[in-house]
Amino acid sequence: SLERIADSLEKKAHNEVDDKVDVAVESSDDTNENENMDYGCSVKEIDVNILIDKLQEKNITVKTYVDSSHENTSLDNVAYFMGNRYNDIRKVYETIKRHLNKPNGFHLDLKNATQSEISASCQLCTTLYDIAFLSEYKYDKSPRYFIHATPNKIPIAINFLTGHWLEIFIRKTIQDSLKSLPAAIEYTYLINPQIILPNGNDFELDVVFLINGEIYWVEGKTGNYQHYINKYSHVANMLNLDKNHSFLVLTDVINPNTTYILSKTFDMTIIPVEEFEEEIKYVFHENLIP
């Protein structure tokens, strides 16, 4: 019953949330490391300039980028949790996002939510509160089943919650997927590089990897993909990337038929966020294993 769920969450939330998020990802990392040892294969990160030169061969000039050695990876586990449990956290995440530019907090009714949605929503809010991305958070158990929260209007929280979490999720998912492959892997990547396209236009890529000499480009959108999808498709053509090398990961498409039609219509693989990990593992298995 909802009352039992609420009672359980109320007692365990602050003790278990970070552990659940961290342990889930750490367990995945441990599994990947064991798989690497079993196969006797290596995953090596190489010089990012090799990727920059590869893009230059396609007449793509990289103007600026963030060195991966300076990248803040402390939010990896939160982003990974959000991506893999997105259907469960959708309602609370979208509510948080809407209130980032509002002065007050919000009250979210979970009376009609599933057990999985309640659990994931409380886990996310507790974690965001613990890392000060929410300035206030409280969960009312039976009979109210309300989340009360206020987003913290600080730059790092706003940047993360408006979409950077999805880029982190994509990058981490790709890195973890590479570790699980029974093949020798050499890779490097860029996050948010500012580039000049062959036609002279400025553009920003979300996540671009070079893996065993092949470029993989992934964009992530947490809303309004309709305004960008045609442009992304044109850029994929400029980069000469097929649908196994160019992806658009979406959070706001619920109907599977929609992503199927989009992928058939545009020159990219368009996929919901919760299906990205399975899809990229399949693509890597097909492309990278001899």
For each predicted feature, which ranges?
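Extended alpha-helical segments
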Residues: S1-D19
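Intrinsically disordered, low-complexity Ser/Thr/Pro/Gly-rich regulatory segments
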Residues: K20-P290
